């Protein structure tokens, strides 16, 4: 609903109604069209004793392929110019409890947000998602069974801030929406206390540091680097995301959180 006609507007797993009628040839044709070295990023982790020999192996693996250009433009994408609401039903097993079983996504499209604004929004979503935030506290008051998280989506034609709530009913959407508006304005006006800011920043910094202790560090790093490259076109995007963690206090001191919150996350947007 947020990005009609774009790649992001389609289910990543495919259109369920089309899958049963797909032929094996169609699957192979799709694989041939998109599973290609020119549409990939090769990442290497660990010590390489003989770089020349390693590069020779890569050359041997990739040499059978001709370089190929890929077009990821979205000519059918039509930007939304007013609020859009879409309700989707999903099947459940007979006897499944459906009370408070709705999942709600509220998306704010941040049209033309600069790289710096996206960096600020990324940290802002982490602050809003924290259990000590005004948003979480206010939501408990009006929808005690609901849980909420917030994240910055960069896969679409425009960056977007997405609020995801579970443990609610379809009829609670307006209550959720009003809670988000009020909480964002409260945050914009009051910011967050230094103690909470320090605690959240320290927790995320520790979480990032502990990644180096994981046994599958190389695999996880490669996946993160590749994902950030695919969504931004910048092979250093993941590094920049990690470095941005140092800016929690800086953005608050400079009033950046309030600035982007009022610009992109209010009822008028």
Protein language model regions, located:
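Charge-rich, well-structured scaffold segments of protease-associated domains
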Residues: 1-75, 101-104, 110-114, 132, ...
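Short, surface-exposed beta-strand/loop micro-motifs that present aromatic residues
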Residues: 29-33, 86-95
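A broadly conserved detector of short glycine/acidic/proline-rich loop/turn motifs that flank catalytic sites
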Residues: 46, 92-94, 109-112, 127
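Cys/His-rich Zn2+-binding cysteine-cluster or related metal-binding knuckle/ribbon modules and their
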Residues: 75-81
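Acidic/His-enriched low-complexity segments
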Residues: 81-89, 195
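A generic structural signal for well-ordered coil/turn residues at beta-strand boundaries
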Residues: 84, 100-102, 120-122, 159
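Active/ligand-binding-proximal structured segments within catalytic/core domains
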Residues: 115-128
């Amino acid at each position: 609903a947020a990005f009609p006609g774009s790649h992001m507007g389609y289910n990543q797993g495919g259109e369920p109604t089309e899958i049963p009628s797909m032929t094996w040839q169609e699957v192979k044709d799709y694989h041939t069209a998109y599973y290609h070295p020119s549409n990939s990023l090769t990442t290497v982790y660990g010590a390489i004793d003989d770089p020349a020999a390693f590069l020779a192996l890569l050359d041997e693996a990739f040499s059978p392929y001709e370089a190929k250009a890929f077009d990821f433009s979205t000519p059918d994408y039509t930007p939304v110019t007013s609020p859009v609401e879409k309700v989707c039903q999903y099947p459940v097993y007979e006897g499944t409890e459906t009370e408070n079983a709705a999942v709600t996504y509220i998306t704010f499209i941040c049209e033309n947000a600069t790289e710096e604004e996206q960096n600020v929004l990324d940290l802002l979503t982490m602050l809003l998602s924290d259990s000590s935030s005004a948003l979480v506290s206010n939501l408990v008051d009006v929808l005690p069974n609901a849980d909420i998280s917030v994240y910055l989506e960069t896969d679409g034609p425009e960056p977007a801030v997405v609020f995801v709530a579970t443990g609610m009913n379809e009829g609670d959407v307006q209550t959720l929406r009003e809670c988000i508006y009020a909480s964002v304005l409260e945050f914009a006006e009051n910011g967050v206390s230094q103690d909470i800011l320090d605690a959240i920043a320290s927790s995320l910094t520790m979480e990032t540091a502990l990644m180096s202790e994981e046994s599958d560090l190389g695999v996880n790093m490669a996946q993160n680097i590749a994902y950030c490259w695919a969504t931004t076109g910048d092979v250093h995007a993941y590094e920049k995301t990690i470095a941005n963690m140092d800016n929690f206090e800086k953005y608050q001191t400079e009033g950046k959180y309030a600035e982007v919150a009022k610009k992109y996350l209010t009822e008028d947007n």
